[in-house]
Amino acid sequence: MALIDVIGWVGKRRWARSVGVPMMLAARRIPLATMVRLAGRRICIPSAGYSAIALSGTSVRDNLCDGALMFETLAGAIERFGLEADGTASDLTIEPQACGCPVTMPDYDTPYVSEHPVSTLEDIRALEVPDPLTDTRMRAMVETVRRLSERFTLLTVAGGSGPFTLAAELIGATEAAIYTLTEPALMHELLEYCTRVCATYLDAIVRAGAEVILIGEPTAAILSPGAYAEFSGAYTARLIAAIPRPVILHICGDAGHLVKGMCETGAQGLSLDAPVDLPSVAQTVPDNVVLIGNLDTVSVLLEGTPESVSESTTEMLESMRPYKNHVASSGCDLSYNTPVENIVAMIDTVRDFR
């Protein structure tokens, strides 16, 4: 039995907590890449938070506003899928809403920011840093993490927005891109504020029991390497330096041009989307940085069959066989409507791969 299987077996059993807790405390002293190499086989961590909600028969809206319900939803998915880590559903509207952005929250789809309230320097200076323990939705996520860490001794993965992505929600993505060229001083002041918000929220997530932090910086994909270094990477690096846990950095879409800059942030793991050629990237990424991904969430996992998912998963694993710093995952968050049998096919294929 591989070490990751032992950890998973212990981590799911309440009565084994006296063994699991010391294991998790020991894991905090080990770099993420070392943990991956010691696992004994390839690890699979699909971004299945929204699929877990579908499996539970509850709504996205209810889960993202109720920490206790989200915990029950995720606990059910851990048991159903036999997940090797527990993690919250990705929701990058939490911080924007706490900062004053109106958010539309469908019952069965991902929420989104519907208005961008910031447009001037005066608007930025009027913003306050929300308290994660009193803001309703931040508090719900903190509670979910706390309950997960109290119930399971698995690697609890949780996190939030990166500074540039939060800034883009406050001011608008198009405006954020333009202002990096025309109003850089304004953008830097906004990013200073956003970094404080992210740091405060992620500190609460860590204190609640998260073992690995995931920073989602999807909007940074619109930046050139130089602009990324100045307007995202520098702030992300400051954020990571203040977090006493391994950090995974995710950028959606074709972020291949940003991989070098992502490595320079100090992130111990890079989560890359399906458009990125993972084997090519693996040749340039240091072996102490974990590469996570990157099955296509739509054409493979949403629209495929268990047989085609297994085939695509095997192809990915074979292409990454030379690289021991790889963790199999979906390229991005799985859709609410992703068939359960396709998720199971991916997980089982990874577990059986030797």
Which functions belong to the PLM regions below?
Residues 1-51, 60, 130-354:
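Active-site loop segments of alpha/beta catalytic cores
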